[in-house]
């Protein structure tokens, strides 16, 4: 069996019909040690004090959706993704994600 270990599988990989299952160990939040990321997260747009926070969360959710999409590359492709990070549930409740992603999530 093929085993691929990478710190980031959200972009740059196209392995159709090759990934039966994958593990996402951690939600890929951007590094708050980066001053630009921190400034964007803390940004308030007018009276919307949480604008930057929501953008930060939406970016992380988009990375999760992209990573999960690596396991399913075609309509007839199958793959299972296990997301282990306990921070995923609160993120899932708060952040935007596409309907097709929400329809495929099953909680264990």
Predicted regions and their residues:
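ASCE RecA-like P-loop NTPase motor cores
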Residues: 1-108
């Amino acid at each position: 069996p093929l085993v691929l270990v990478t710190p980031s599988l959200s972009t740059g990989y196209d392995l159709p019909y090759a990934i039966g299952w994958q593990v996402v160990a951690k939600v890929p939040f951007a590094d708050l040690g980066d001053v630009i990321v921190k400034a964007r997260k803390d940004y308030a747009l007018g009276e919307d004090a949480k604008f930057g926070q929501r953008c930060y969360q939406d970016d992380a959710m988009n990375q999760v959706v992209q990573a999960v999409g690596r396991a399913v590359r075609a309509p007839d492709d199958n793959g299972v993704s296990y997301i282990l990070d306990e921070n995923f549930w609160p993120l899932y409740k708060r952040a935007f994600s596409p309907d097709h992603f929400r329809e495929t999530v099953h909680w264990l």
